[in-house]
């Protein structure tokens, strides 16, 4: 029996309750596919600060480094907002990304037919949207030096530096091509090559890498045009790959196109490690009430199966079970609409588990 070690970082707010449901789904997947998942829990974020004074204790980092993948709930909350910046819960997550060199952020954006009215776009424009935005996460203008606010002759000025090395570009571009190859074989590279030298180099390297992926269709779009096309023709996108700042903007825009924050999973991937987490925050206002939507976390676990464990069929089975659950009318309060059946965190997972059992034969 194949065995995988998963670091489980439940975090703050609704984190523990939504992660608990994702683990129930993983256990069911293990049963269906004859795989064993071993969970090792670690502290992170506000909970870690309260217990150890550190948003990322060394013990947690050790657990992550000894695992095959990491599943995270959520970090942060108003309780810790007044702490010094370097001691806030979010610092724990940033440090994990840095320590494990998680350079590729994957943000799927899929419109579910049952939730199509949640999108701010017209149904005929958005129906069938299923894309993934891959954002370079560890370099670019957010990290470049020199940076800062300075004063000269009594006037202030500010500097930020956008810098990418060839290796940094090449590895994220390869990740884009590889993921496109596993999907619908179309890659959109987004840059500003008509103005920025960094983007000109980016485009050159994309063209060089294209030689290694002749089966993948490639298009180049400028960032401004891409931002427009995302709302004009979202269904035309499969995989988007881009730098840090452009990816920051486009991944949020793609999420709004979908319209349901509680349905958005994400992954941060490196060459050795990968971390999976929902896009939404810790929602402390509803923590412990049993009404949080666990679907984004369950979908994040499904991404883990696909991208860390190469269990593509298991990933597809989970997506199908969620789709069926939504089609049957079950909704947590955040995605509820009139005529549907309002259920809680555990109840919607119960329905997903029932559908996993019912649909499993088509995916094994």
Curated annotation (Swiss-Prot):
Its EC number is 1.1.1.85. Mg(2+) binds at residues 224, 248, 252. Keywords: Amino-acid biosynthesis, Branched-chain amino acid biosynthesis, Cytoplasm, Leucine biosynthesis, Magnesium, Manganese, Metal-binding, NAD, Oxidoreductase. SUPFAM superfamilies: Isocitrate/Isopropylmalate dehydrogenase-like (SSF53659). Coiled coil: none annotated. PROSITE patterns: IDH_IMDH. It comes from the Bacteria. It catalyses: (2R,3S)-3-isopropylmalate + NAD(+) = 4-methyl-2-oxopentanoate + CO2 + NADH. Substrate binds at residues 97, 107, 135, 224. Its cofactor is Mg(2+); Mn(2+). GO terms for cellular component: cytosol. Pathway: Amino-acid biosynthesis; L-leucine biosynthesis; L-leucine from 3-methyl-2-oxobutanoate: step 3/4. GO terms for biological process: L-leucine biosynthetic process. InterPro entries: IsoCit/isopropylmalate_DH_CS (IPR019818), IsoPropMal-DH-like_dom (IPR024084), Isopropylmalate_DH (IPR004429). The record marks 142, 192 as: Important for catalysis. It is an enzyme of class 1 (oxidoreductase). NAD(+) binds at residues 77-90, 281-293. Pfam families: Iso_dh (PF00180). One of its GO terms (molecular function) is 3-isopropylmalate dehydrogenase activity. Catalyzes the oxidation of 3-carboxy-2-hydroxy-4-methylpentanoate (3-isopropylmalate) to 3-carboxy-4-methyl-2-oxopentanoate. The product decarboxylates to 4-methyl-2 oxopentanoate. NCBIfam families: leuB (TIGR00169). Homodimer. Belongs to the isocitrate and isopropylmalate dehydrogenases family. LeuB type 1 subfamily. This is 3-isopropylmalate dehydrogenase. It comes from Aquifex aeolicus (strain VF5). The lineage of its organism: Bacteria, Pseudomonadati, Aquificota, Aquificia, Aquificales.
């Amino acid at each position: 029996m194949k065995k995988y070690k998963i670091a489980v970082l439940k975090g703050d707010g609704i984190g523990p309750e939504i992660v608990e449901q994702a683990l129930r789904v993983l256990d069911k997947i293990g049963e269906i596919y004859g795989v064993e998942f071993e969970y090792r829990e670690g502290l992170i974020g506000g909970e870690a600060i309260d217990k150890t004074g550190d948003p990322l204790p060394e013990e947690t980092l050790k657990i992550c480094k000894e695992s095959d993948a990491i599943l995270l709930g959520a970090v942060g909350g108003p309780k810790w907002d007044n702490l010094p910046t370097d001691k806030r819960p979010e610092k724990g997550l940033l440090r994990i990304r840095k320590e494990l060199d998680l350079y590729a952020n994957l943000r799927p954006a899929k419109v579910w037919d049952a939730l199509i009215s949640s999108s701010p776009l017209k149904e005929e424009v958005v129906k069938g949207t299923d894309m993934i935005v891959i954002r370079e996460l560890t370099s670019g203008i957010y990290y470049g030096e020199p940076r800062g606010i300075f004063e000269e002759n009594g006037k202030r000025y500010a500097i930020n530096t956008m810098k990418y090395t060839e290796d940094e570009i090449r590895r994220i571009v390869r990740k884009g091509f590889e993921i496109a190859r596993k999907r619908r074989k179309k890659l959109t590279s987004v840059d500003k090559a008509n103005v920025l030298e960094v983007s000109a180099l980016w485009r050159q390297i994309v063209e060089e890498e294209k030689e290694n992926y002749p089966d993948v269709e490639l298009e180049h779009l400028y960032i401004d045009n891409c931002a427009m096309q995302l709302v004009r023709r979202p269904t035309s996108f499969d995989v988007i790959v881009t730098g840090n700042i452009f990816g920051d903007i486009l991944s949020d825009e793609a999420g709004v196109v979908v319209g349901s924050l509680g349905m958005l999973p994400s992954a941060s991937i490196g060459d050795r490690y990968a971390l999976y987490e929902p896009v939404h925050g810790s929602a402390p206002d509803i923590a412990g009430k049993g009404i949080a939507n666990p679907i984004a976390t369950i979908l994040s676990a499904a991404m883990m199966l696909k991208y860390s464990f190469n269990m593509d069929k298991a990933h597809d089975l989970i997506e199908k079970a969620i789709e069926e659950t939504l089609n049957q009318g079950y909704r947590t309060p955040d995605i509820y609409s009139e005529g549907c059946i309002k259920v809680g965190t555990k109840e919607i997972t119960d329905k997903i588990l029932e559908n996993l059992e019912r649909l499993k034969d088509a995916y094994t």
